[in-house]
């Protein structure tokens, strides 16, 4: 399972490691909407996590999101949207692609 290193208080990149603590499947493609919402809440984006709930973004949808989707489609303020994409969505996509390419 994944856990998020909460020593990072600036909403920047967080360490994602295997753990049994939070109950999310290790592969983001298997996350339900609630897993995505909880991931962003745990990462310090309490307010912005609601947008993922409202737009019904599950793990598969999260992995398909473009920078433009995050910056405009979720109707978030620019600062948090940039951090969410650069420090969370993009790294999750990269890690998923790396783990699933053989």
Swiss-Prot record:
The SAM domain, residue ranges: 31-99
Source taxon at top rank: Eukaryota
InterPro entries: PcG_chromatin_remod_factors (IPR050548), SAM (IPR001660), SAM/pointed_sf (IPR013761)
A Pfam family reported for this protein in Swiss-Prot or TrEMBL: SAM_1
CDD domains, per database record: SAM_Atherin-like
SUPFAM superfamilies with a match to the protein in the record: SAM/Pointed domain
Chain positions covered by the region annotation Disordered: 1-29
The protein's name: Sterile alpha motif domain-containing protein 13
Organism: Mus musculus
Gene name of the record: Samd13
